[in-house]
Amino acid sequence: KSLSEYDWLGLNYNYADIEISDVQVPTIYLKNETRTTSRISPSFIRDTRDNFMNPSSGSRHVVRLDLAGLGGTKFHKASYEGSHYWPIIGKLVGMVHGEIAWADGYAADSLPAFERYYMGGPKSLRGYQIRNVGPKDSLGNPLGGNQSLLLNLELQYPFTKGLRGFAFYDRGQLYGGGNDTSTTATTWDLAKMRDSIGAGVRFLSPFGPVGFAYGVKLDKATGETDGEFHFSAGNSF
């Protein structure tokens, strides 16, 4: 529902039967299971960007809640995501994006693996493989986390109306989720976050925004690559 030119309220309902199978080494956090989820999700959006595809000023804020328990698995989630754009000098544009999220089960139910947060890739923490940041099991498989913290900073320069180059710094981490070989933190710990820098381009194709980027890890761990190439479709932040 539109409240004004810039503000919207949303209310969604979702019902799903989800099955996880072919887990080779089941754990209490990731195992073969079938769960029924019935959830209600209210949200609030405020968007003052001057252009949805290539903004140079304004901001976008999203607050979302999820409550599942009207039948099936019981859990709740809360998240805030915000982006702000501002002109710096000439055509140069600054962008800051942040996201904080929390989730947990209740009434003796645990948070399902498919409802945990995952990080890494072109639309979260660049320079890292998709979903490969945060808690892992003893074999190195991502477990996801119950808490997520992400920061993205960009300097953007529009070469043409439909082509924009950018340089970035990303910082983020997941917390919780059990046995963890990448960080021992189970709650917020700003000292145990991952960092990357890089650059890329975005352009407007006939099918929508498309992006290419390369990110370099600033805190490469043993066995990790120096960085990652990324391809993305759709708006990043």
Give a label for each model feature.
Residues 180-200:
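A short alpha/beta connector and helix-capping loop motif
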Residues 121, 127, 196-200, 208:
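Glycine-centered small-residue hotspots that permit tight backbone geometry or close packing
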Residues 82, 197-199, 233:
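Extended, hydrophobic alpha-helical segments in both membrane/secreted and soluble proteins
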Residues 11-162, 167-186, 223, 236:
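C-terminal outer-membrane beta-barrel translocator/porin domains of Gram-negative envelope proteins
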Residues 2-8:
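Secretory-pathway-linked proteins and extracytosolic
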Residues 41-44, 201-210, 226-237:
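Outer-membrane beta-barrel "beta-signal"
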Residues 165-168, 209-215:
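Conserved active-site loop/cleft motifs that coordinate metal ions or position small ligands
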Residues 157, 173-175, 201-209, 216:
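Short leucine-rich amphipathic alpha-helical surface patches
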